[in-house]
Regions:
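Nucleotide/phosphate-binding catalytic cleft detector across ATP-hydrolyzing
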Residues: 1-15, 19-207, 225-227, 236, ...
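Glycine-rich nucleotide-phosphate-binding loops and adjacent flexible coil segments
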Residues: 241, 251-255
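Glycine-rich phosphate-binding loop of actin/hexokinase-like ATP-binding domains
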Residues: 204-245
Length: 277
């Protein structure tokens, strides 16, 4: 059986990251290579501002991935793209359908509802993903409606949305300037939460915070599903720029932050001296 490969690109405010992995016959994914390229001011708050600069950075990342011994001489043709940014948020939509008497609900019926919800017009927003929250069959809540018989099915869906400019500029970079097809969009905070959070944490309820360079995304989980997403226009670069007030350039401030900073307070005061500050 021919091995399958999957490529993902993340276009962040501080760097462009790319990863390629192989999928074996059991569906197991093995990461083969990861590359990144720093960007400065060409992506702001998760939205591409300078298409040419981002195009060059993505091209370099992909070129290095293709040169990896585990990949060469294969060429990358399509990629999955991570989506985040200041405009990322969620909208709750309820959709109902009436079925013939005593109809067994199937995956096909569920997918029809999801498709209808995904094509819902949201003012000044593009729908990236649809996350089911709750299902009701004949007004009774059921965790999984597949296999249940009923006459009415109501779905409470969480639409993950962003400004059209996000996807439009991604398309300009990857499909118009570069020779790639977009295999799909991945909601970055949701993908990270699926890796970090346990099933119990999602079921009992928690808030997951994705702290980026210029944005911070908060995701609320309850009853094992995503309930809410909101994004704040601030991130780790705010800390870096505070450090530049000590009369050092941003690159040095970033290095100092990474070397000496900690997100977890240990209760003890520490004094650090940096040369030239």
């Amino acid at each position: 059986m021919e091995q399958k490969y999957i490529v993902a690109i993340e276009i962040g405010s501080s760097k462009i990251k790319g990863a390629i992995g192989s999928i074996d016959e059991t569906g197991t994914l093995t990461v083969l290579a990861v590359e990144e390229e720093k960007v400065l001011d060409s992506v702001r708050y998760g939205c591409i501002q300078n298409v040419d600069m981002v195009c060059n950075a993505v091209s370099q990342v992909v070129s290095r991935l293709e040169q990896d011994p585990g990949i060469a001489p294969r060429k990358i043709k399509s990629v999955y793209v991570s989506v985040g940014g200041r405009s990322l948020s969620s909208v709750i939509v309820n959709e109902s359908t009436t079925l013939p008497d005593e109809t067994e609900i199937t995956e096909y019926i569920i997918e029809q509802i999801k498709y209808k919800v995904k094509t819902t017009a949201i003012a000044d927003r593009d729908v990236i993903d649809v996350v089911p929250c709750k299902y009701f069959v004949d007004k009774q809540m059921v965790p999984n409606p597949v296999g249940v018989f009923g006459q009415t099915l109501t779905a409470k869906m969480n639409l993950i949305v962003c400004k059209p400019q996000i996807k439009r500029n991604i398309n300009r970079v990857l499909c118009e300037r570069l020779p790639f097809a977009i295999a799909g969009y991945i909601v970055r905070p949701v993908a990270i939460a699926d890796i970090v959070l346990t099933d119990n944490e999602k079921r009992l309820g928690c808030m997951f915070v994705d702290f980026g360079a210029e944005t911070t995304t908060e995701s609320i989980y309850k009853d094992a599903v995503l309930q809410y997403i909101a994004t704040l226009p601030m991130g780790s670069r705010n800390i870096t720029r505070d450090i530049t007030a000590t009369n050092c350039i941003e690159e040095k401030a970033e290095e100092f932050k990474i070397a000496h900073g900690s997100a977890i307070a240990d209760g003890s005061a520490k004094k650090t001296t940096a040369d030239g500050v």
